[in-house]
Curated annotation (Swiss-Prot):
Pathway: Steroid metabolism; ergosterol biosynthesis. The gene is cyp51A. The sterol 14-alpha demethylase activity is inhibited by azole compounds. Activity is inhibited by the novel and long-acting fungicidal azole, PC1244. This is Sterol 14-alpha demethylase cyp51A. InterPro entries: CYP450_sterol_14alpha_dmase (IPR050529), Cyt_P450 (IPR001128), Cyt_P450_CS (IPR017972), Cyt_P450_E_grp-IV (IPR002403), Cyt_P450_sf (IPR036396). Its main location: endoplasmic reticulum. GO terms for cellular component: endoplasmic reticulum membrane. Induction: Expression is decreased upon exposure to voriconazole. Expression is regulated by the GATA transcription factor sreA during hypoxia. It comes from Aspergillus fumigatus (strain ATCC MYA-4609 / CBS 101355 / FGSC A1100 / Af293) (Neosartorya fumigata). Changing residue 98 to H: Leads to resistance to azole compounds. Gene3D superfamilies: Cytochrome P450. It catalyses: a 14alpha-methyl steroid + 3 reduced [NADPH--hemoprotein reductase] + 3 O2 = a Delta(14) steroid + formate + 3 oxidized [NADPH--hemoprotein reductase] + 4 H2O + 4 H(+); a 14alpha-methyl steroid + reduced [NADPH--hemoprotein reductase] + O2 = a 14alpha-hydroxymethyl steroid + oxidized [NADPH--hemoprotein reductase] + H2O + H(+); a 14alpha-hydroxymethyl steroid + reduced [NADPH--hemoprotein reductase] + O2 = a 14alpha-formyl steroid + oxidized [NADPH--hemoprotein reductase] + 2 H2O + H(+); a 14alpha-formyl steroid + reduced [NADPH--hemoprotein reductase] + O2 = a Delta(14) steroid + formate + oxidized [NADPH--hemoprotein reductase] + H2O + 2 H(+). Its EC number is 1.14.14.154.
Amino acid sequence: MVPMLWLTAYMAVAVLTAILLNVVYQLFFRLWNRTEPPMVFHWVPYLGSTISYGIDPYKFFFACREKYGDIFTFILLGQKTTVYLGVQGNEFILNGKLKDVNAEEVYSPLTTPVFGSDVVYDCPNSKLMEQKKFIKYGLTQSALESHVPLIEKEVLDYLRDSPNFQGSSGRVDISAAMAEITIFTAARALQGQEVRSKLTAEFADLYHDLDKGFTPINFMLPWAPLPHNKKRDAAHARMRSIYVDIITQRRLDGEKDSQKSDMIWNLMNCTYKNGQQVPDKEIAHMMITLLMAGQHSSSSISAWIMLRLASQPKVLEELYQEQLANLGPAGPDGSLPPLQYKDLDKLPFHQHVIRETLRIHSSIHSIMRKVKSPLPVPGTPYMIPPGRVLLASPGVTALSDEHFPNAGCWDPHRWENQATKEQENDKVVDYGYGAVSKGTSSPYLPFGAGRHRCIGEKFAYVNLGVILATIVRHLRLFNVDGKKGVPETDYSSLFSGPMKPSIIGWEKRSKNTSK
């Protein structure tokens, strides 16, 4: 008993000593070190500000910004992480040179077990740029035009067949429903009918298990034998085998005319600059990446859109009236005609709703890079040392009143007078997968910027636009049980989204579109 008491006492003294030394170090660090950004004060070494950051990143960022300014450093699970907020911070980090900053070292431990080896962050950046160029095949203008009827059909089939929407009215967990809809639309549009037909209950379970690999703990312990990691690895192996089987069978049979326009066929015929044909394993891994990338942000944002419309039914009716006015009735029953790509340009308020939701509810709150060489911060005395992690948060500028008055208010009408395009004088650069705008001069960067800017931005707008327009013309949405507003944000995953379950009410419209 006595030894145990002594051990407890020693441990308590050790902890208190560590805390005291940590506080003393921070005080002297501020006095002596003028070449590094200020350190966010914290009591517990190693843990640092991890908890407050993890609970609500934006609340943490804004509180630190008020106290320390746009540039500060905090401890994230023992790692010194320097945050640089604002438009200049976005430019500094997201457009950093390859020799200075590196994304692969930050994200590879998390993404490689999910996406697979030799793709995305598990390969040299030059190879990733080639892979992005291959993938852009499915994101051309003609491809996007062909996606519209496919996406619309998937949404209509879901509204007709899903148990969530049987009868004339009911309730639905809209986060779960939009996750299902967006995996169907992403698979059908980006991957083809052959892959879409394999989205059975088994495939959905595999996707779910694979998605669990993006839990924050996997930044630190990606290969730990935890239950969710075992399921992740099994799901990846099974999903890869599904794609490899498709590829193998196609090589035996030869491509059919109906397949010659899909992504798998495209990748099967791609060759790297060094003359190597893309291996089947890498094709499978790129297809897994494409499916998850095409679904993740669309799932979260589409759920937020529906939740916002349910909380403000008047906005939903504005959208409906826009379709009636600009697309016009067609058949004898007054039903609206099937959507076409050109129709999306006739629905500006639909685009405003999407943009405003992306502004407030971006699914990625932090973008990180690893510093590779001493990095001076222009206009400051600061020098960021190698090994430090840099963190940009474009969502902070999007939520700042200086750029968007009353920024915390969801108001799609603000975009009627708000410039939506990047500044005309913004530089255009080719990182190896086609010319893109650097983009960082804008306070609105829902798809990132620089060499790692999302290449699926146009597809995302098309996908979200068609999903939104289709649901608006078929359903009314509303909050239930007297609830006001929308749910809180769940930051427990790498991709934030609404707290689950997110229950709203729905009611089917009359076949006559005037009712």
